[in-house]
């Protein structure tokens, strides 16, 4: 083999090695974003219309965790007539509020039996009070787990009202759109299923003003609780959904 031929042969070997290295690096990086070595356990806090319904599915898909929306969980347990669902329905039919213990046990049931929760969870709609937060911490401690972040979506009330009065919902999935800020590809139609979108009857300024007042009254102590634990992160939710998502990813990437 001449010198020039040997040189070409070595170059081809180097090229093959570089291709192999690139392939292995891609494989190594690929699963990391989808199945993180460290589990993600986070809570998403925000007033109605702040973007929880947009961001929570992104967290779920990016980190392969389960999205635990407590309202949906409660309805599901009631429909399936589970022991927890039967107990909850009895309380609701009597006009009462479902107890903190029942809600925490519903979350615990998901963590124990929902395969999608094996890498962690994003919790949406709970806790709303400090006692609920304490019970949640206690349940996680029993499982030798703990929260690693609490993200609050921050937005001015008046901007929020203008957002919500244009909100459109896909009833079956909970996917949300907005007539101006995040419109569906076809007006009034869900992008994925082609089914019609609706506007909730309580998405009006008067109702929203009352709901926001309740939200601020409830949330303040819970936020202070998590701030004291060093878990709280605030994100400006007045920005576009993609910018909000980038901010949230930065928080999750920096978790310990």
From Swiss-Prot:
Region (NMP): 69-98
EC class (word): transferase
Binding site for ATP: 49-54, 167, 176-177, 239
Major place of residence: cytoplasm
Region feature (LID): 166-203
Catalysed reactions, semicolon-separated: AMP + ATP = 2 ADP
Disulfide bonds: none
Localization in the cell: Cytoplasm, Cytosol; Mitochondrion intermembrane space
Pfam families in the cross-refs: ADK, ADK_lid
InterPro entries: Adenyl_kin_sub, Adenylat/UMP-CMP_kin, Adenylat_kinase_CS, Adenylate_kinase_lid-dom, AK2, P-loop_NTPase
Gene3D superfamilies per the UniProt record, alphabetical: P-loop containing nucleotide triphosphate hydrolases (3.40.50.300)
Alphabetized UniProt keyword annotations: ATP-binding, Cytoplasm, Kinase, Mitochondrion, Nucleotide-binding, Transferase
Binding-site residues, AMP: 70, 75, 96-98, 125-128, 132, 200, 211
Gene Ontology BP term (one): ADP biosynthetic process
Family (UniProt): Belongs to the adenylate kinase family. AK2 subfamily.
Subunit structure: Monomer.
Function: Catalyzes the reversible transfer of the terminal phosphate group between ATP and AMP. Plays an important role in cellular energy homeostasis and in adenine nucleotide metabolism. Adenylate kinase activity is critical for regulation of the phosphate utilization and the AMP de novo biosynthesis pathways.
Protein name: Adenylate kinase
């Amino acid at each position: 083999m001449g010198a020039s031929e040997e040189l070409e042969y070595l170059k081809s070997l180097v090229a093959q090695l570089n291709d192999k290295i690139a392939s292995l690096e891609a494989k190594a990086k690929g699963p990391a974003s989808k199945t993180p070595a460290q589990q993600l356990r986070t809570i998403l806090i925000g007033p109605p219309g702040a973007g929880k319904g947009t961001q929570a599915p992104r967290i779920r898909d990016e980190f392969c965790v389960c999205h635990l929306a407590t309202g949906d969980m409660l309805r599901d347990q009631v429909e399936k007539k589970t022991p927890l669902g039967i107990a909850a329905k009895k309380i609701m039919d009597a006009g009462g509020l479902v107890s903190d213990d029942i809600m925490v046990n519903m979350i615990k049931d998901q963590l124990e039996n929902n395969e999608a929760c094996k890498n962690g969870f994003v919790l949406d709609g709970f806790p709303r009070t400090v006692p609920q937060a304490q019970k949640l911490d206690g349940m996680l401690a029993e499982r030798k787990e703990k929260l690693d972040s609490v993200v609050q979506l921050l937005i001015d009330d008046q901007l929020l009202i203008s957002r919500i009065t244009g909100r459109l919902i896909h009833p079956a999935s909970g996917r949300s759109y907005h007539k101006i800020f995040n419109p569906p590809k076809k007006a009034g139609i869900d992008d994925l299923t082609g089914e019609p979108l609706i506007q909730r009857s309580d998405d009006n300024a008067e109702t929203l003003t009352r709901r926001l007042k309740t939200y601020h009254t409830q949330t303040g102590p819970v936020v202070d609780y998590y701030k004291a634990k060093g878990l709280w992160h605030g994100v400006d939710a007045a920005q576009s959904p993609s910018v909000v998502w980038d901010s949230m990813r930065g928080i999750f990437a920096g978790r310990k």
